[in-house]
């Protein structure tokens, strides 16, 4: 993608870089019209977190990674914003887990799918990774959903037992949970339908959450915690934001 004009010394350089990635992705036809609105909403919650990864987010990331490692058929699901903001991190995590990536978007058009598949395969080649990227020929549907957004791959999302779906919409999250899957979401809004309905919710900015998981992968085996409480994680995320709001008042 093109160079960013902002200086790396800018205190919010990371945020400016993410905005730039979205601008470039939009030019390539990778994003839905509402993509920038969704990102801006997430940024507002990140301000309240102090743009940092909390202890509760690390707890959720560790549990998520343990479930992915122990899974029989883990899958990482990618939409337009995820590809633009953290495509490399998704591919590196998929490589470490030995699992496929499936491009699965809410507003599905042939043009967007072509752009997203092209981008992810470009990044895969640039990173020198051997990762299966699905999405070009869906051959199944997610029960409970209608229209193009229900399309998926049998060998990907449909057969998965544990699925990471960052920035997922509420309907699809609930449909995947109803299928009996362990559903992991990354969502800065602890009150969203996806965050509330998922099995594991990482309340953190996307690239930070994925980099946390990559660091944990390199650190050695993870252990599934049978006492993990997602409601407690959501509450801790919300409390961290309330503290941030009070401190900034």
Spans of model-derived segments:
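Electropositive, gly/pro-rich neighborhoods at or near active sites that engage anionic ligands
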Residues: 1-100, 228-249
């Amino acid at each position: 993608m093109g160079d960013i004009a902002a200086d790396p010394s800018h205190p919010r350089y990371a945020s400016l870089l993410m905005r730039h990635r979205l601008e470039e992705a939009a030019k390539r036809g990778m994003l839905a019209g509402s993509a920038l609105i969704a990102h801006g909403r997430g940024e507002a919650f990140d301000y309240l977190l102090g743009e940092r990864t909390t202890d509760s987010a690390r707890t959720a990331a560790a549990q998520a990674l343990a479930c992915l490692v122990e899974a029989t058929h883990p899958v990482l699901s990618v939409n337009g914003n995820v590809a633009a903001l953290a495509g490399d991190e998704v591919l590196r995590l998929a490589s470490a887990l030995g699992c496929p990536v499936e491009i699965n978007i809410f507003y599905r058009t042939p043009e967007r799918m072509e752009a997203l598949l092209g981008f992810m395969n470009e990044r895969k080649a640039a990173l020198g990774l051997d990762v299966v990227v699905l999405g070009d020929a869906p051959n199944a549907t997610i029960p409970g959903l209608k229209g193009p957004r229900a399309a998926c791959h049998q060998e990907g999302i449909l057969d998965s037992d544990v699925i990471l779906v960052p920035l997922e919409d509420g309907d699809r999250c609930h449909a995947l949970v109803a299928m009996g899957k362990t559903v992991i979401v990354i969502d800065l809004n602890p009150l969203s339908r996806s965050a509330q309905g998922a099995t594991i919710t990482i309340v953190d900015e996307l690239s930070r959450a994925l980099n946390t998981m990559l660091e944990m992968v390199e650190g050695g085996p993870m252990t599934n915690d049978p006492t993990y409480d997602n409601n407690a994680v959501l509450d801790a995320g919300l409390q961290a934001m309330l503290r941030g709001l009070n401190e900034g008042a």
